Design a protein with these regions (language model features):
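Intrinsically disordered, low-complexity segments enriched in small residues
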Residues: 1-13, 17-178
C-alpha cells in the first residue's frame, strides 16, 4: 500500500488504561511541541511533569522499553512507547501500550520518534470528580435498563434503541463490507 500523502490529517484510537490514567492525573490530553535535543520520555505523575533521559532505552523494542520503565517507576504506571520503527520515523510506526494495545493508524510512532520522545509514562492518583453526580446516576440507570435484555442485544438496531448510529467499529452491516 502507498504511504500517507503529506500534509495529512490522521486519527487513531488505542485501548488499555493509558487514557484513564492520564485523566486520573488531571489531564484531558497532551500536546507536544518541538523536538527534544536527545532521546527522552515524558513522565507525568499527577501535578509533576518532567522530561527524563531515555538514552538507555533508545534502540530497544516496545516490550523491553515497557518492562524497563515499569521497573524504573512502578507496575501501576501506564506507558505508551515506540520501538525502533518509530525512532527511525517509519511512516506506519505504531505507539504501543501494554502487550496488546496500539495506535496503528497514521504513523504516530514516527511522529514521536521525530520529537526524540521514546515514551509517555503516566501515573494518576487524583480520581475523576463528577460534574453532575445525579445525571451520572441517571445515565447508569438507563444503561442498566438496556442491559437487562442481555448484553448481546446492546447496540443492535433490532433492540429498538433510538438514535443508533453505525460507526467504523459497528458489527451490524459494516463487517459485511470489509
Amino acid at each position: 500500500p502507498r504511504g500517507y500523502p503529506t500534509p495529512m490529517w490522521a486519527s487513531a484510537t488505542m485501548g488499555g488504561y493509558f487514557g484513564a490514567e492520564l485523566k486520573y492525573a488531571g489531564y484531558d490530553g497532551i500536546i507536544i511541541h518541538g523536538r527534544a535535543p536527545a532521546p527522552c520520555y515524558l513522565l507525568i505523575e499527577d501535578d509533576r511533569v518532567s522530561l527524563e533521559d531515555a538514552g538507555d532505552l533508545w534502540g530497544k523494542g516496545i516490550f523491553a522499553t515497557q518492562q524497563a520503565l515499569k521497573a524504573r517507576h512502578s507496575p501501576h504506571h501506564q506507558i505508551a512507547t515506540i520501538g525502533p520503527a518509530g525512532e527511525n520515523r517509519v511512516r506506519f510506526a505504531t505507539i504501543a501500550h501494554r502487550l496488546n494495545n496500539a495506535i496503528g493508524n497514521g504513523g504516530f510512532g514516527g511522529v514521536l520518534g521525530a520529537k526524540n520522545l521514546k515514551a509517555i509514562v503516566v501515573r494518576g492518583t487524583k480520581g475523576v470528580p463528577l460534574a453532575d453526580p445525579q445525571g451520572f446516576l441517571q445515565a447508569v440507570r438507563q444503561v442498566w435498563q438496556m442491559a437487562k435484555g442481555g448484553i448481546y442485544r446492546i447496540g443492535k438496531p433490532d433492540a429498538g434503541y433510538p438514535h443508533l448510529a453505525c460507526t467504523h467499529a459497528c458489527s451490524v452491516r459494516c463487517f459485511t463490507r470489509v
